[in-house]
């Protein structure tokens, strides 16, 4: 049985959905971020692809996003590489990239894995703030019941592909 519902959709349409409608926060920022490309290049590339704006406008949007997620001195940090950021700061970069096109839905896959408790709390506060200040919904994929208790108003559990429950 074919379960790929995106089959038949054009690549341009799928790309538009992926950035403008749905965005993703990945579990491991170092796997997502390219270690040999500056943060500026990685952030502005997606902004320019979706918003059709100038390099300067994309750079200004990247600075705005970095401020929004709590990265200090964003103008100077744009020129840095991912390895120059802490784990928590890299996760903030991933969140900023996810917010770049004002998506309607953000899927966060284990967004606090491998972060210490203090940074984890900061990231959860940031996700809470984002959902309160924007029209975006957030789906959190996690095994951490502390994250669930902190953020979720609806819980969907799936211990196996056949057994599912909503509470």
Segments from the language model and where they lie:
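Single conserved hydrophobic/aromatic residue that forms the stacking wall/gate
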Residues: 2-13, 156-167
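ABC ATPase NBD coupling module
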Residues: 1, 7-23, 41, 49
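P-loop NTP-binding/switch modules centered on Walker-like glycine-rich loops
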Residues: 115, 119-165
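Conserved ABC ATPase signature
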Residues: 80-85, 89
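Catalytic Walker B motif of ABC-type/P-loop ATPase nucleotide-binding domains
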Residues: 106-109
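Conserved ABC ATPase "signature" region
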Residues: 57-76, 128
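A short, proline-enriched helix->beta-strand linker immediately N-terminal to the Walker B motif
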Residues: 100-104
């Amino acid at each position: 049985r074919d379960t790929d519902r995106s089959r038949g959709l054009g690549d341009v349409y799928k790309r538009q959905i992926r950035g403008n409608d749905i965005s993703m926060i990945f579990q491991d920022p170092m796997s997502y971020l390219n270690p040999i490309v500056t943060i500026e290049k990685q952030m502005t590339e997606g902004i320019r692809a979706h918003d059709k704006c100038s390099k300067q406008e994309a750079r200004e949007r990247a600075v705005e996003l970095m401020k929004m997620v709590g990265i200090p001195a964003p103008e100077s940090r744009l020129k840095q590489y991912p390895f120059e950021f802490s784990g928590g700061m890299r996760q903030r970069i991933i969140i900023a990239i996810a917010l770049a096109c004002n998506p309607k839905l953000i899927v966060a896959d284990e967004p606090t894995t491998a972060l210490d408790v203090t940074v984890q709390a900061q990231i959860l506060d940031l996700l809470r703030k984002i959902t309160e200040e924007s029209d975006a919904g957030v789906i959190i994929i996690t095994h951490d019941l502390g994250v669930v208790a902190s953020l979720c108003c609806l819980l969907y559990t799936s211990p196996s592909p056949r057994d599912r429950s909503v509470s």
